[in-house]
Every structure is written in structure tokens, then in C-alpha cells.
Amino acid sequence: MKNLFVLLTTGMMVSASFAQSSDSSTYYYNRGLDEKNARRYREAEKNFNKSFQLDPQNLDNLLQLASTLMEQHRYAEAREKYHKAEVIDPNNKLVVENLATLSFNMRKWEDVIRYVQKMQQLKIGKGADFLMARSYYELENYGEAIKYCELAVKEDAKNAQIYYIAGRSFMDMHNYKRAAGCFDQALALDSTNSTWMYEAGLVWYAVPNDQKALYWIEKAGEKGYKKSNDYMENLASAYLNAGKFDKGISVLQEILKKKPQDQELLYSIGEAYYKTKKYPEAIEYWDQVLILDNKNANALYMMGMAFQKKGDTQRGVMLCDKAIEMDPSLKKLREERKMPGGL
């Protein structure tokens, strides 16, 4: 009888304690809602946390806590809370959709795919195919990326990023013509993205279409793309390839001020002058290459060609012969009357 009394008493105490805990959890939950509605998110978070400590299985409280963390841009912590909510209710639509979005923003690409597939099963949310396309692209699965781009464009044909992802996927598979078409479609929808413009220029260069390559590389610079040495060198190449030699040479000379002993730059300027039949200038720049590297057979050979073009045949032939001694493969160029590089 005494044991029964102890059990009953203990049971009543546990029940009372549970009820008190539940009441306290509800109290802090309601206070959290009030603070959140007043946009005092830090105070709301404190109350939702107290409620969570008292009742970890309260799904509504967990969702409010996660939402409050998101309002404070604390996405990793919010994602952790949504994961706890997922354990309680794996098919909760709000939980699944937010986990997909947070995983996307945090570049957790495999998780994005998993949650988007769940979104599709639950038939919720929008833009699922775009999220899949981007995730597969980042995972370097370009075939799947393009497949989902084709699906995504049916849902939102005005989303420029869809065409950009498709373009990058084709580019990374070296299908430059398809890539170029996608870049053009992306830029038709977003005419402000200088990075896309620059990449479009590089893709058109690879096609090759020299005029379109120059157009987009120039446009990128006009729209604010950083004019790094790499950008300027590609701009110079685009000018030269498009036959605008004066502009190309001018850009190369500007770069040379920053990289005064760059042999490739010096060689390229000499090559550009040679193509415009300015042979003394070409000789001057190839001579600078040889000062830096007297074993550069290509520069020596081209000096010889330039001397021949300007009428000093004997000296030119002598230099070409010396270059061929240094690099016998140049003999074939003489026979074909080509420049090094097949030009």
C-alpha cells in the first residue's frame, strides 16, 4: 500500500511538472511571437529558445525560431533548426521548401537536389527546375544541368540565369557554338551583367567569330568589368583578330608599361607590326625579345623575315638560317612561308 502511495504521488508530481513545463513553454512561445511581430528579432529568439528548451518537440516554436534566425541573416543556425523540425515532421512543406532554399544559398548542392526532389513529390514551391539546373552545374554534371535548364525555361522563359547556366555548361563541354547562342539569349534578357559579356566574348573567340568576340569584350569594359591585365590582353587580341591593328597595338603597349619585360607581349607587338607591314617597328620589338632571351628562335626567325620584307634580303636570310639552326622545325615554315604559330 505504501509503495502504491509513493507511485501515485510520484506520478502526480511528474504530471504537474509536465503541465507546468508545457505552460511555461507556451508562455515563452507567445512572448516570442509578440517580440517577432514587433520586429525585435533578438528578443524573439531568446523567448523561442527558452520555449524550445522546455519543449523541444513543439514544431510551431521551432519554425518560428528558424524564421527569426533567418530574419537576422543567420542562415546556418536557421538551417540547423529546420533540420530539427524535419525530424519531427519530414513532409512539412514549409520545412522542405526552406531547407531547399537555405541549402541553395549555402551552396550545399547535393542537399539542394534532395530537397527539391522532395518539393516535387509534395508538389510545392516554384523554380524547382532552376534550382536543380544550378546544382547540377555546380556539381559539374553538365548533361543534367542542361536537361533541367530546358525544363526551367518552360516555367520562366524570362530568367536570364537559366540561359547563362546552359551557356556555361556547353562552354565547359567545349561546345562553343551552342554556348554562344545561350550567352546571347542571357544577355538579351540582362544587358547589364559585365561578367557575362566578357565570358560571351571569350566564347565567341573560341567559335571563332572575331567581330562578336570584340563586341562583347568591349561592351564588358564599358559596363564596368575590371580592366585587369588579363582583360586588356584579351581585348588587344580581339582587336588584332578583328583587323583593328592600331587599337590592338595601343592596348598591348599600355600593358607593356606594367609588364616591361614580358616576352610574349613584346613578341605579340612585333607580330602586329609585321602584319601591318611596319617592319622596322616589328624588328625593334623582336630585338627586345632577343635581348631578354638570345635563344628565342621564333623571334630571331621573324626578325629575319622582317628584314627580307623591308628589302635587306641577305641579312634576313642569314638570320632565318641561324634561327633554323637553333630550331630545325622552323625550316618547314620557310618552305611554307608562314610565321611561327601557323600564321
Role assignments for model-derived ranges:
Residues 54, 88, 121-123, 155, ...:
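Structural marker of alpha-solenoid helical repeat scaffolds
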Residues 2, 17-76, 80, 87, ...:
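N-terminal leader/linker segments that initiate helical-solenoid repeat arrays
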Residues 30, 64-67, 71, 98-101, ...:
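Canonical tetratricopeptide repeat
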Residues 37-38, 71-72, 105-106, 138-139, ...:
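Register position in tetratricopeptide repeats
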Residues 24-26, 241-243, 301, 305-343:
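Terminal, low-structured helical/coil segments at or just beyond the last alpha-helical repeat
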Residues 27, 61, 95, 128-129, ...:
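TPR alpha-solenoid repeat register
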